[in-house]
């Protein structure tokens, strides 16, 4: 006892404080666990759990009110799939403690304003939906909710604002109606009719230039590719016609109607949508993905129609589950297959359709592509007797519709399918796809199979791929990924540079230095010597050919051998590739050596950019060069180009970040500076200001390179597409060839995948390249892109 008392005296009672803090933390953690887990599988009914939890929270309100408020606001934002469970809980708390209900509504409005200010529009939709469902729980008075929606729809009358801003407020209103439409119409039918009329008027006049760029398929058969607001409007119209009868939303508050209807309600404070600013970034429009209908599962429960509001609710809830649990594939899969009401719907079909809808979403999926692969694999493990069959059916449907599928989505389909096969011993009924063998190799189906097998080889090895596919598919199988060394056989003796290649080979094997290699290359004759331009003397194609061919041949054993070779003879590479022509020729020779190994080409280009042997513009020019024309539509070529663009973008962002950090550091120094004359601080400021000036120059230079890269890419696209269009017009043939479809959609892909960066250079692109004189087929792509954020 004395020791304990002595300890208290010395510590000023700190252990007691710590125990208090520890107890408080334990209680808070317990409350968080209870709130987050309500609605999960339990021996008791949901209603019983909600009533019990409301009692626990009410008892803890005196001590933990701010924590409970914060938790409930967070789950409203982050767990939208359990929306009605939490609105019921708030309703029960409001019935027991009116003041708490008022504070919660105020906190939600604050959170909504913060989300809109921070451009978190997806979360803001969930908050609006939550508030609207509180009307059903007698927490919020219906007239004040109608007033808020009136303010939302009034945004459609704003002038000089982007259409995507108006779209969001209309979507926030319409997407809440499956939950609260009936209640609002019963209380305020005239006002709701007026809002509906304004909404309809807006939807009729809004522009939809962007739609073709966002469609997964160019054809509307068998399922229309509807713009998201058009589809939702049709669903709400049908719901209204059906007298707001909706049969799928879980509504636990109905069990507590006698309690909730006695509660006092709160009026929402007047809500004015925050004005549009230059920093406002609204969600892009979407096209609704449809793959299945009721005919695809004739034996199971009937799938709701595409304009049924149940279809919207189911899909919305499944998207919410993926959004909440995507980082944990096992949990995510378990949550999806245990979806409430699963016995009333063909759940596996809905799950597969929703996953592919996200994977194929343009311009980009909500989550990293590989997540969808791992999630589908996990679902196949959880439901081995049913889900693999639905997935196979979906794969067959996608294959059958390849002719009209967006090239970007075909790329994702290739990557998903090859990765999926690698997890199931590459088993597939290839004979079912033998129709592709009679088609032109550039047609979508044989091209798809070829690219899938190429990707499968990356995940396996060449001989294994030959073994798993029928012999009839040999024309579509990838080539043996071996190095092609032009100086390697006897017939090469007469080739220019053959003797130098032999000398280089011996030197490389003897671990020669860069200077020794320069010495061997010194006397290689220059075919460009006759040129008058200065670059002709510096650019020696034969010297590059002999050096690159021989070095890559000797380093062909593995990726790491090739990387080591690039690193060891980096000085030679830099000297030979000093000019633009030199950089281009290094890439050409590398491609000749590894033309049968796309993966090696990709990693070597990546390494050459990182080590500054070649630059991004050189890679872009190489991709559009005549040497690559035979492989121009191959997937690996476009993976290289997109990787190159991403590297340039990262480079610019890195320097911009360094500049911002330097500016912040200078601002902190100014803030800390005392009133005294501190010459040391002046010196530090001077050094920092010089650093900022240098970084500013680097940023401007990098941005200039970035802009130039996009100008090169778009200029080359315009040139080759214009040549094709003129040739077709001259010959009197159709422009709609497989090559044209691939090329014009690759142009769309560049715009979509790098839209945030390209938007910075819109004025330059419009003034220099995408002018009114351009062919309408090409100009249409630019106009569709402009409409995405218009």
From Swiss-Prot:
**Where in or outside the cell?**
Nucleus; Cytoplasm
Q: Which residues carry this modification: Phosphothreonine?
A: 21
* Protein name as it appears in the record: Nuclear cap-binding protein subunit 1
Q: Can you tell which superkingdom this protein's organism belongs to?
A: Eukaryota
Give the protein family. Belongs to the NCBP1 family.
This chain is encoded by the gene named Ncbp1
UniProt-listed Pfam families: MIF4G (PF02854), MIF4G_like (PF09088), MIF4G_like_2 (PF09090)
**Species this protein is from:** Rattus norvegicus (Rat)
Question: Where is it found, in Gene Ontology cellular component terms?
Answer: cytoplasm; cytosol; mitochondrion; nuclear cap binding complex; nucleoplasm; nucleus; ribonucleoprotein complex; RNA cap binding complex
The record's region (Disordered) falls at 1-26
